[in-house]
Amino acid sequence: MSHGPSIPVGVNLTTIGIDTRWWLDTACRLEAAGYAGVWAWDHFVSRGRLDDPMLECWTTLAATAAVTSRIHVGSFVSNVMNRHPAVLARMVATIADLAPGRVELGIGIGGHPAEHTAYGIEFPAPPERAARLVEAVGVIRALFTGGPVSTQGAWYRLDEAYASPAPTPVPRIIVGGERPAGARLAARIADGWSCMESQYDALRPVFDAALAEAGRSRSDVAVIVGCDLPAGDAAGTSPAMTDPVAWAERWRERGADELVLHWVKGDQVEAVLAAGERAWG
C-alpha cells in the first residue's frame, strides 16, 4: 500500500452543468480514493453562459459534510461581496458543528462582474473590496469565538452578535490571492494563502517578503496551490494523474504545503479517482 503524496491533495470540483446528487456521489468517491479535501468555488453564474445550471457553494458544501466522514470541505474561494461576513461566519460555524475540524473557509475579493450585475450585488473597485476583506476576516474571526461581538467598522456593524455553537477547532481562513496585493494580504491576515500554479513563481517572493514584514513565520500561513488539469484530459495524462506521488513531492520541494486539483470536470473525474487509487491504494 502506498503512503500517498507527502502533502495533502484536494479536488476543486466543478459546480457547473451537474446536479447535487452527482456532486455528493463524487465527493464520497473522492473521499474513498484518499483525497484530503473537496472544494467548491463561490459563483452564482458561469463565466460562459449566465443561464448554465450551477450549484451554490455553501449549501453544496453543507450537504457534502453530511454525507462524508473524513474529507475536508471548503470554498476555493468565497467572494467577500456575496454575503455579510457575520452571516457567512454563522454558515461556516454551523457546518463545522456538523463536521468538526473538516471545514475550510477560503475567501477573496471576487472577480466576476457579470454575476454582480445579474444579482444586483455591488462590485466596488479592487482596493475597496480588499479593505472590506480585511474587515470581514476580523468579523469572522471574532464570531468564531462564539460572541458576543460588537463592532463599528467602515462597512460592517454588529451589536452583540453571536455565532453559537462556536466552531471547535476553529476553521482556517484561507485568503485567495493571485496578484501581489492579494499575496501580501494573505501573508498579513490569513491562516492560508491560495494561488494558482501559473502565478506561484512570481508571487511566492512577494508572499515571503510580506510574511517577514508582518513578523509572521512560514509555519503561520499554509501555502495552497491550485493546479489545473489540461482541458479535455479525460484520459489523465498529466503528471498529477500519472504519478501523483512524485508530482506532489516536486511541489513540496517548491514550498507548497497543500495542492488542489483545480476545476475538475465531469469527464476528468474517473482519471482523478484512478490517480487517487494509485497514490493511496
Predicted regions and their residues:
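Active-site-adjacent structural elements that line small-molecule/cofactor binding pockets in enzymes
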Residues: 1-281
